[in-house]
């Protein structure tokens, strides 16, 4: 095949050049004679024979140099065939490349043949293609890439890319055989000359010339004058992106980046270039920032400063600003670069606040066009830049009407005429940095830049958390190590089984370690940088996040914002940075219960919650008590068509508010033992949410909204109910986790709850927040405010609300911390405080009936709990606990009868609870009672009337004295007598010998 083709082409050249080019004819005749003289063997043999005859290719070279398209077509065709079959003599490689260059300006067929020959030349003559030969091959591709025919230009660009890639692959192969190849070439470095081997020297010269061509400066190795700066930058980007490890190990390449590439890429931020040049420069800058930040800290500082200016500048074109933000987003998303940048610049002595300035720019950027992001009083659903004409669409109805309540809770409250941020219209189909085919800057969605700011906030939180969270776990913890509140390791297995069972995930909970206490050399600097970022940048983070917390965001954007906010707050708390932690918690609290929603709910609901609210004090698990609210919503959907008019809807909590509440609770779970007085933020927020969800006016709102919208009622109620259930579960886990708190932290939690029983404010330091993060002011009312709840007009009503919220929580805390109470001092463990606070409520006739019953019930269960907890303990341990537990029952009874007022039905109900608790203790562990029998008899004796001059019971440290001569034979009431008789019957029948 090869011999035939060559013979035919030579014959054609002889025929066509008889009169026009005698030299070509003579050379062709000689080559044809040489070809015919070769033995007719295999193709491989013919190629090998031809490779030993350098003169054979002369007619083809002459044909290419003749500037005749017809001659050149034959010459190039033959040279291509010889290259493919390795029949081209190596001595003629340079001549062949010169011939290719000479023919590059001829016809389309000739150019295609040249481009087809070059890959084979690279493959079959790779070892020989170096120095000037390499430069010649690259020059051919570069000149053809500037061809006007798109086909030729595209193929030439791909071929040039292939050749450049091969150059760097040869460097990798050479590095693997470095010991066998001497370094013979020296090039200038940053400090001193660098010695290079052959392949590395070629790669250096090619890369340097590409960088020079991008700056439109004269090249030194390859003639690239015909190569456009944009094409040069694409090749440079490909080299750097595809050979990361190679560049790191070759300082001469890094030196070229520093001296040529970085200045060019950085100037694109401050100079005005067209889109094609700018996008390629910023792609390179993005690559260098994310991959070689540590190699060029000084240059990166300048670049980041210009990026900040580009983000903050109104003079930048929208597409340039968007590209700058994309580079910033990628910088934040790559590893821990932002932490390294802070340590390198902001934290250094005399360093510039690079990271701080960048985050401060986010604050200004996020608030520059509030209408575009749909900024309002709270977060809402984005409705899109163009409204829909179909009013029957559920999403459109919710958005246009701004309806609040359970329906909109499932979707989020939307305000009319907002655009907002959504993946449907805020994101371009292709990022700006990837639009290399555009000659003009693309149209950028107005809200695109805000999506990237949200991404930056999320990435920042992730980076901080990845550094800090792994260091907060105590490495020496194991299942055998109890928390501070459990110190009974020597107890038997049966004793441990009798204790209150808690989920295993919280059994090993302990105070998170403070990572800043770690003194390891490789960890401490990064931790100090993280702490510095939070300490100096939290106002900017908070202000930016606060803006978006009240913007119209798509669901996923909002959830990611909350997750990032939660992580940032958690890191601040774990590092014991209390000021930023408290400010962030407060902002999250206000997003969970917006002031305008709280004001509307508390101001509009003046009915007594004791009659309107369906909640039960004894319902410890249904912590937000909204089951009846949801069931009302479901049942009311059936009569929506019968209502002739709808009252104006008022603000209501949404699923997004509940999501914020859940995030706040999760933070309390993660940081609980370290929160201190800040725990009151969590308690107050939970109480406010409970107030709104259980308020009579809120339930009327549900009735209003469901009456007007029925076709999506079930799904909306289900979504709202699911979020409420998630919040309730988080509350349960929070209360459960207190079992592993140190006693001091647990007492703080108790104080956060018990202060509400007497409307006693617990001191909290003022929490600094930036002005940008301040929520709308709460409308004032003419009523006096109690417990921070506006609109509650009477002290009694405030107390009733707080009792219904607090007492069930105290019951949960008591249940979860029974082991703590029996193992520690009563005052240190919080037992004394819990009993005193609940006792004041239970025995006071001025307190609401339901509150008294609930407090008495909690006390009775706690008293029984501590007695049951020590059944398997030694007599010494049991005696003290049994006296304490039974003494509480006696204190309740004594407190009821110590007041100089007539007994009420509530007093008798509480006394009945006490007698039932006593009976339960006797039934379950009466045979293990070693102390407290005097208190038992005193409680039973309280069922009888006493004379007018009878003193109260006298309880000593160990004994209780009952002066029976003052006890009559008449029962206080018949039910009380029956309850006392049951307990006494147990004593007489089973435990008489123990008295």
Task: Report each predicted region and the residues it spans.
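Alpha-solenoid HEAT/Armadillo repeat architecture
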Residues: 65, 84, 104-105, 123, ...
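Short coil/turn segments at secondary-structure boundaries
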Residues: 76-77, 87-88, 126-128, 157, ...
């Amino acid at each position: 095949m090869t011999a035939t083709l060559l013979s035919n082409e030579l014959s054609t050249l002889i025929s066509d050049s008889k009169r026009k080019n005698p030299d070509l004819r003579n050379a062709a005749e000689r080559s044809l004679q040489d070809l015919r003289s070769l033995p007719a063997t295999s193709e491989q043999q013919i190629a090998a024979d031809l490779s030993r005859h350098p003169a054979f290719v002369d007619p083809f070279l002459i044909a290419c140099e003749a500037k005749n398209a017809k001659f050149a077509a034959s010459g190039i065709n033959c040279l291509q065939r010889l290259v493919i079959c390795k029949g081209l003599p190596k001595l003629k490689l340079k001549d062949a490349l010169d011939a290719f260059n000479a023919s590059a300006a001829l016809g389309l067929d000739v150019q295609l043949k040249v481009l087809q020959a070059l890959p084979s030349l690279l493959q079959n003559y790779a070892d020989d293609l170096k120095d000037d030969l390499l430069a010649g091959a690259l020059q051919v591709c570069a000149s053809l890439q500037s061809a006007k025919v798109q086909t030729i230009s595209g193929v030439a660009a791909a071929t040039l890319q292939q050749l450049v890639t091969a150059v760097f692959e040869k460097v990798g192969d050479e590095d693997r055989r470095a010991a066998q190849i001497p370094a013979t070439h020296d090039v200038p470095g940053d400090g001193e000359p660098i010695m290079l081997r052959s392949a590395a020297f070629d790669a250096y010269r090619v890369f340097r010339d590409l960088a020079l061509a991008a700056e439109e400066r004269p090249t030194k190795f390859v003639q690239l004058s015909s190569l456009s700066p944009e094409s040069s930058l694409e090749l440079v980007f490909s080299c750097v992106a595809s050979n990361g490890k190679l560049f790191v190990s070759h300082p001469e390449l890094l030196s070229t980046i520093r001296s040529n590439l970085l200045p060019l890429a950085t100037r694109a931020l401050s100079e005005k270039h067209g889109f094609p040049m700018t996008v390629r420069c910023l792609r390179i800058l993005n690559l260098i920032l994310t991959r070689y930040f540590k190699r060029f800290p000084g240059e990166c500082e300048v670049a980041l400063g210009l990026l900040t200016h580009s983000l903050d500048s109104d003079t930048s074109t929208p597409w340039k600003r968007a590209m700058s933000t994309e580079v910033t987003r990628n910088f934040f998303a790559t590893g821990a670069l932002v932490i390294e940048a802070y340590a390198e610049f902001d934290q250094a002595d005399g360093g510039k606040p690079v990271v701080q300035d960048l985050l401060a720019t986010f604050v200004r950027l996020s608030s520059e066009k509030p209408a575009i992001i749909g900024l309002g009083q709270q977060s809402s659903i984005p409705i899109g830049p163009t409204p829909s004409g179909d009013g029957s669409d559920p999403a459109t109805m919710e958005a246009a009407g701004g309806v609040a309540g359970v329906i909109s809770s499932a979707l989020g409250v939307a305000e009319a005429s907002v655009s907002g941020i959504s993946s449907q219209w805020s994101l371009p189909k292709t990022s700006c940095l990837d639009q290399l085919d555009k000659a003009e800057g693309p149209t950028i969605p107005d809200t695109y830049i805000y999506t990237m700011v949200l991404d930056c906030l999320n990435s920042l939180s992730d980076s901080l958390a990845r550094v800090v969270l792994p260091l907060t776990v105590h490495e020496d913890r194991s299942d055998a190590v109890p928390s501070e509140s459990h110190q009974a390791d020597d107890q038997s297995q049966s004793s441990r089984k009798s204790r209150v069972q808690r989920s295993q995930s919280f059994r090993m909970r302990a105070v998170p370690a403070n990572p800043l206490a770690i003194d390891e050399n490789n960890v401490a600097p990064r931790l100090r940088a993280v702490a510095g970022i939070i300490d100096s940048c939290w106002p900017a983070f908070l202000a930016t996040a606060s803006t978006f917390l009240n913007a119209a965001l798509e669901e996923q954007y909002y959830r990611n914002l909350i997750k990032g906010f939660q992580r940032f707050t958690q890191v601040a708390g774990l590092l014991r940075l209390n000021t930023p932690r408290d400010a962030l918690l407060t902002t999250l609290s206000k997003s969970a219960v917006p002031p305008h929603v709280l004001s509307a709910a508390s101001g509009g609901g003046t009915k007594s919650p004791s009659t309107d609210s369906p909640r039960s004090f004894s319902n410890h698990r249904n912590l937000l008590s909204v089951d009846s609210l949801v069931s009302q919503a479901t049942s009311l959907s059936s009569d929506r068509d019968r209502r002739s008019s709808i009252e104006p809807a008022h603000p209501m909590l949404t699923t997004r508010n509940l999501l914020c509440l859940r995030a706040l609770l999760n933070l309390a779970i993660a940081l609980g033992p370290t929160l201190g007085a800040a725990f009151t933020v969590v308690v107050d927020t939970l109480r406010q949410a409970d107030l709104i969800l259980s308020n009579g006016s809120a339930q009327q709102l549900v009735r209003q909204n469901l009456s007007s919208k029925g076709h999506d009622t079930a799904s909306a109620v289900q979504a709202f109910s699911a979020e409420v259930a998630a919040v309730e579960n988080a509350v349960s886990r929070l209360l459960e986790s207190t079992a592993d708190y140190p006693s001091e932290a647990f007492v703080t939690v108790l104080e956060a709850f018990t202060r509400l029983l007497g409307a006693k404010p617990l001191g909290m330091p003022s929490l600094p927040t930036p002005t940008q993060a301040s929520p709308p002011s709460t409308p004032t009312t003419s009523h006096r405010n109690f417990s921070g709840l506006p609109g509650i007009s009477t002290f009694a009503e405030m107390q009733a609300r707080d009792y219904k919220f607090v007492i069930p929580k105290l019951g949960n805390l008591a249940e979860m911390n029974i082991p703590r109470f029996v193992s520690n001092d009563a005052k240190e463990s919080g037992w004394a405080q819990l009993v005193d606070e609940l006792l004041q409520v239970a025995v006071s006739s001025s307190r609401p009936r339901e509150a008294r019953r609930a407090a008495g019930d909690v006390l009775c269960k706690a008293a029984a709990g501590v007695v049951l907890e020590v059944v398997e303990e030694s007599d010494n341990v049991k005696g003290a606990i049994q006296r304490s537990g039974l003494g509480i029952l006696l204190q309740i009874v004594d407190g009821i009868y110590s007041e100089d007022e007539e007994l009420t039905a509530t007093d008798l109900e509480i006394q009945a609870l006490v007698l039932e608790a006593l009976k339960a203790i006797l039934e379950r562990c009466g045979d293990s009672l070693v102390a407290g029998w005097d208190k038992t008899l005193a409680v039973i004796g309280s069922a009888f009337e006493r004379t007018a001059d009878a003193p109260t019971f006298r309880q000593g440290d160990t004994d209780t004295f009952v002066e029976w001569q003052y006890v009559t034979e008449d029962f206080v009431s018949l039910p009380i007598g029956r309850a006392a008789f049951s307990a006494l019957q147990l004593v007489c029948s089973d435990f008489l010998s123990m008295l």
